[in-house]
Amino acid sequence: MVIIKPMIVQVHQSGYRLDYILSKLLPQYSRSQIKHWILNKKVVVNNQVSTLPRKKVVYGELIEIKYINNNDICKSEDIVPQNIPLNIIYEDNDILVINKASNMVVHPGIGHYQGTVLNALLYRYPSILKISKQAGIVQRLDKDTTGLMIIAKTVSAYDNLLRSFKLRKVVKEYDAIVYGKFTSNAGVVNQPMRRHFAKRTFMSVHYTGKSAVTYYSVVEEFKAHSRVRINLKTGRTHQIRVHMAYINHPLVGDQKYKGNFSVFDIKKMSDELNNYLLDFNRQALHACTLQLLHPITQVQMKWNAPLPQDILQLIAILKKY
């Protein structure tokens, strides 16, 4: 068991989020790891368990972290460089753009200590952890979402990219295959999101959440499914998956959010199609376009990544019926 000394909130820390303050007090641990501890009742504030990462701390409060096992910890210095192939789309002295494969976590965390994008980056760029705790990673894609990611290779590029994302100056477009057909060719989902009250690894639409805006347009329609192009104004965790499920068009293969849509309009499907959909083992989501000003040269940059083979095969089968 790892013992972490109790901490007292100082005057200048009062009013900040619990997860933020802990990430500053414990820089050797990632923020996602700290959130994991909070959500799993490992953090105690003034003798009361706190399960809200967004809880605002107050001057003088005592923060304790209890019962942390060695298996629950992944420190930055423990991340192992691994010779893992990366599909590099673009690279210069300041940035790197990759086309992430499916079944690949971006950053090590609970249950995923190896085989991540960061493990691969450390192998190619051993000093990249000096840029930040996130090792130059300024955006994330879900484990099973494929497509474009930009990574900073210098501190200046990292800071400028973070600023661009915060100011929403980065264009991110996605291709998705969803259940159902739409009544209009384009639309917007403007619904706030927050962590689910009961299912703590889920996100949900809720009026107390943070602003989340998703634009979509129909690219292609099939008998009981659609291919849509999605543009994000905000970048909340699982935003596309949650918003599309909210409007009753969940992503094909999304085991987490599609609910009962595994049998959506099953009468319209052949056995071959139905079996293929049931076996499609990831959300059909691909980050296809990334556009921004280069963080150092300020030149307009744009990258496109073609659809991966599994989604192309899915589209081919959908076209047959």
Curated annotation (Swiss-Prot):
This is Ribosomal large subunit pseudouridine synthase D. InterPro entries: PsdUridine_synth_cat_dom_sf (IPR020103), PsdUridine_synth_RluA-like_CS (IPR006224), PsdUridine_synth_RluC/D (IPR006225), PsdUridine_synth_RsuA/RluA (IPR006145), RluA_PseudoU_synthase (IPR050188), S4_RNA-bd (IPR002942), S4_RNA-bd_sf (IPR036986). The keyword Isomerase applies. Its main location: cytoplasm. Responsible for synthesis of pseudouridine from uracil at positions 1911, 1915 and 1917 in 23S ribosomal RNA. One of its GO terms (cellular component) is cytoplasm. SMART domains: S4. The active site is at 142. The gene is rluD. It is found in: Cytoplasm. GO terms for biological process: enzyme-directed rRNA pseudouridine synthesis. It comes from Blochmanniella floridana. Its EC number is 5.4.99.23. Residues 16-93 form the S4 RNA-binding domain. GO terms for molecular function: 23S rRNA pseudouridine(1911/1915/1917) synthase activity; RNA binding. Belongs to the pseudouridine synthase RluA family. Keywords: Cytoplasm, Isomerase, RNA-binding, rRNA processing. Pfam families: PseudoU_synth_2 (PF00849), S4 (PF01479).
